[in-house]
């Protein structure tokens, strides 16, 4: 059962990944090692626009209609959420056990939202930035008011100009407490999985930036950078949302032990309180607005109160690109989990390099420096970035659940992203957009969004019976009186067998 818990980023409510629903790992009767099925969840932020492409601050009316329609259709109303500004909404999935199940829930919810929008004369603009000048209206909420006062009213508006897609990967039970503290007392195997997934997500950051780039225009102009990334993180000299506040808005370093995550959280809190003091905001206001460790973290990779590692790197995008990138991330994460790989940074490493029980990754200074800079400038056209994406795809491929979903990303030597497709459609483009060009871009994106959703619904809509997890029919193997729930039809495989299969695939793909 899903617990109805507050969304610490705002007034919306979310379903928590309940730790008691995931069992610990154990040794099976044949000596092989089984793992419980780790869940995932997806969040996609959208701009509300009218049929001409103009932004509309009608989130509350739209959400009321979505909630009513969801109840009528047997969908979860909690999957339709408010955001920090009145012209943006978030559509999510409940916790799901497979890419197929997540895809079906995502598409069903998008289909409902598109129908509601059409009835209201609205559309959902799906990309990471609105292309024309936009001054969003901040939602009246104590949490947002405090945050805007700390960051600055004008800078906080970037939060309403940037839309993202976030993927949650479930962590072992007991590794992250509800107040988002990393648990030092968790079992060693659980801590290792936590560190592996967190470090993998950190290493993936520049590849995900490059693959997910969408709208090249921000406030009516383009400068060749990944617009949402530089304006949200406030990097490379841009006066963005978290400029000068790397601890709370930038990519954090790898963690070699759980204590490192605790130290990062402490530094984040300290930096946030220092920013409050500089802004003259009383600390009691933060506490009164429900302040906790989660409310002081908007990093691209963070531990979530849902008991997940949340990957927030990606631009909001067309559904097929969102699903493609999520399928790629899930496959990489499953390989780390099932092979129990230690993700270890090393000097001279420029790509993901599996080696026995290790996954070698570049140093953090390279990932968050040279490689990230390349990802937000030349992007996929940069040879370093392309080689890095190659290594990510090669590493993840053996564990892809639905290989057809990643086809929109292209292949080695011809990777694709939405940004390059948009730029190719704009004739005689300069550094700025005319208003007509911008509105046309928005309308075309909304139209493409609709077409993709209904096309994908025909293929994947409705939770497939084979993917819908029902504990009542799942096969349960009892190990020392502790149940391990395996996906229906899944045979428990030993770690050695999985490693051998993946390594053979690596050789074939090399």
What are these model-predicted stretches?
Residues 2-104, 112, 116, 158, ...:
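C-terminal accessory/tail domains of diverse enzymes
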Residues 121, 209, 337-341:
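Secondary-structure transition/hinge residues
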Residues 125-135, 142-165, 169, 174-264:
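Metal-dependent DNA replication initiation modules
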Residues 77-165:
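Well-ordered mid-protein domain cores that form the structural environment of catalytic cofactors
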């Amino acid at each position: 059962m899903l617990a109805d818990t507050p969304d610490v980023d705002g007034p919306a409510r979310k379903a928590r990944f309940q730790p008691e629903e995931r069992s610990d790992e154990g040794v099976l009767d044949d000596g092989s090692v089984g793992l419980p099925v780790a869940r995932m969840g997806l969040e996609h932020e959208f701009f509300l626009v009218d049929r001409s492409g103009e932004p509309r601050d009608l989130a509350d009316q739209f959400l009321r209609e979505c909630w009513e329609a969801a109840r009528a259709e047997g969908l979860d109303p909690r999957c339709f959420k408010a955001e920090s500004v009145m012209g943006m909404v978030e559509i999510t999935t409940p916790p799901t056990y497979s890419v197929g199940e997540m895809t079906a829930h995502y598409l069903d919810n998008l289909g409902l939202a598109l129908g509601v929008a059409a009835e209201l004369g609205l559309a959902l603009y799906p990309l990471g930035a609105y292309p024309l000048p936009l001054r969003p209206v901040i939602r009246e909420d104590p949490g947002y008011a405090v945050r805007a006062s700390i960051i600055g009213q004008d800078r906080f508006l970037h939060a309403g100009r940037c839309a993202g897609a976030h993927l949650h990967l479930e962590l072992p039970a007991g590794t992250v407490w509800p107040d988002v503290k990393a648990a030092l007392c968790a079992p060693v195997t659980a801590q290792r999985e936590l560190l592996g997934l967190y470090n993998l997500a950190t290493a993936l950051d520049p590849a995900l930036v490059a693959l997910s780039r969408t709208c090249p225009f921000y406030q009516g102009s383009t400068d060749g950078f990944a617009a949402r990334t530089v304006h949200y993180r406030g990097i490379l000299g841009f006066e963005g949302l978290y400029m000068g506040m790397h601890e709370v808005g930038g990519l954090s370093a790898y963690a070699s032990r759980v204590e490192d995550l605790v130290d990062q959280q402490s530094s984040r809190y300290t930096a946030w309180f220092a920013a409050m003091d500089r802004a003259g905001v009383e600390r009691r206001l933060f506490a009164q607005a429900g302040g906790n460790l989660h409310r002081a973290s908007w990093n691209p990779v963070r531990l979530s109160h849902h008991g997940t590692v949340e990957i927030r790197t990606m631009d909001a995008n067309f559904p097929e690109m969102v699903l493609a990138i999520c399928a790629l991330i899930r496959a990489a994460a499953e390989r780390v989990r099932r092979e129990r790989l230690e993700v270890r940074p090393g000097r001279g490493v420029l790509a993901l390099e599996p080696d026995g029980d290790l996954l070698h990754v570049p140093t953090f200074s390279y990932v968050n420096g040279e490689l990230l800079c390349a990802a937000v400038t030349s992007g996929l056209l940069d040879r370093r970035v392309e080689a890095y994406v190659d290594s990510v795809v090669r590493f993840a491929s053996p564990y892809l659940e639905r290989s057809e979903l990643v086809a929109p990303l292209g292949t080695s030597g011809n990777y694709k992203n939405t940004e390059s497709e948009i730029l190719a459609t704009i004739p005689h483009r300069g550094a700025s957009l005319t208003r007509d060009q911008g509105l046309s871009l928005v309308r075309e994106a909304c139209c493409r969004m609709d077409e993709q959703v209904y096309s994908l619904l025909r293929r994947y809509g409705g939770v497939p019976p084979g993917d819908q997890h029902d504990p009542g029919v799942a096969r349960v193997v009892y190990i020392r009186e502790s149940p391990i729930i395996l996906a229906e039809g899944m045979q428990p495989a030993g770690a050695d067998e999985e490693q051998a299969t993946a390594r053979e695939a690596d050789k074939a793909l090399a």
